[in-house]
A protein has these predicted regions:
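Glycine-rich phosphate/diphosphate-binding loops that line cofactor/substrate pockets in enzymes
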Residues: 9-22, 74-83, 203-213
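FAD-binding core of FAD-dependent oxidoreductases
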Residues: 31-35, 66, 91-93, 163
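Conserved phosphate/anionic-ligand binding catalytic regions in large, soluble enzymes, centered on
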Residues: 24-39, 154-161
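Short glycine-rich or small-residue beta-strand-to-loop segments that form or flank ligand, phosphate
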Residues: 23-30, 84-91, 122, 214-221
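Glycine-rich oxoanion-binding loops at beta->alpha junctions
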Residues: 1-12, 39-84, 93, 99-100, ...
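Alpha-helix capping and helix-loop boundary segments enriched in small/acidic/polar residues
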Residues: 61-69, 73-74, 91-99, 120-123, ...
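Conserved strand-to-helix beginnings and helix N-cap segments that scaffold or border functional pockets
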Residues: 36-37, 72, 97-101, 133, ...
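Active-site phosphate/pyrophosphate-binding segments
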Residues: 111-262
């Protein structure tokens, strides 16, 4: 459970980055970025880039693919803007974010020099070990820890998700309080008929035992598309072992009614 002191540290770091940069690239893959991406998309104006005044940095994502076009175009688009980065990886050796970070790091160092670049890069990684922890120590990056007992896909309420969200202007204190309220509503001692999490788990298990192997999550707002992607990460990675588990898929309605719903 994140403490008020940890929230303050995340907010302070976010303010520091925001004072230095107009664009902040968040580098990660899978659970290391999908939680933050889902919350950011769900809580943001989809047309905010058209507003004349930007009072918060623009948050972009990298390291979630190996497309050379994507990285080239990202760096080209950010040339006119002051740049910073948040790199998220437990080990620092996951291929996609490792490649993206090397390229973004080189861009920042070329622009500002190594000393100034170190102020513009924050690493979220293991407390003691791993390639990214070693590099962060050598370069003097500010760092936050990925807790040992929390997998990446569950980490949105740790600095993994909270730092990118705070940079984007999301009130992370309110977000955490909302999660705490929901945790109380779904605690193990809450009766079945009042507990939506237990009801959902029971329904999934009953249908799985009847032979249903595919579950489709439908959303009705484009801003929830990445909530669906995060949901697929949560269930696909958690249950998809040894040929077991329900296959998670998603549709965005009403658009997908004209394809998947035919």
């Amino acid at each position: 459970q994140i403490t008020p002191a940890q929230l303050d540290a995340v907010n302070d770091c976010a303010k520091s980055l925001a004072s230095l940069a107009e664009v902040i690239v968040v580098i990660g893959i899978g659970g290391s970025y999908l939680g933050a991406k889902a919350v950011l998309e769900a809580m943001s104006d989809p047309f905010q880039l058209l507003h004349k005044k930007q009072d918060k940095p623009i948050v972009l994502f990298a390291g979630q693919n190996l497309s050379e076009d994507y990285l080239y175009e990202l760096l080209a688009a950010t040339k006119p803007y002051k740049l910073a980065a948040i790199v998220i990886s437990k080990s620092g050796t996951t291929t996609e974010p490792a490649v993206a970070f090397r390229i973004v790091k080189e861009e920042i160092e070329t622009r500002y020099g190594k000393a100034e670049a170190a102020k513009r890069i924050v690493a979220v990684t293991d407390a003691k070990r791993g390639a990214l922890r070693t590099l962060a120590t050598q370069e003097g990056y500010a760092t936050f820890v990925i807790p040992d007992d929390i997998g990446g896909r569950y980490s949105v309420l740790t600095p993994v998700g909270l730092l990118p969200l705070a940079v984007a202007g999301i009130n992370i204190g309110e977000l955490v309080r909302g999660a705490q309220d929901m945790a109380k509503m779904t605690a193990a001692d809450v009766p079945f008929d009042e507990n939506p999490a237990v009801q959902y788990a029971a329904a999934r298990n009953a249908l799985y035992k009847k032979g249903y192997k595919i579950e489709i999550l439908a959303s009705y707002d484009p801003r929830l598309q990445y909530v669906s992607e995060w949901w697929k990460q949560l269930y696909g990675e958690s249950e998809g072992k040894e040929g077991k588990g329900i296959f998670p898929a998603s549709v965005t309605l009403t658009a997908d009614l004209h394809s998947m719903g035919q």
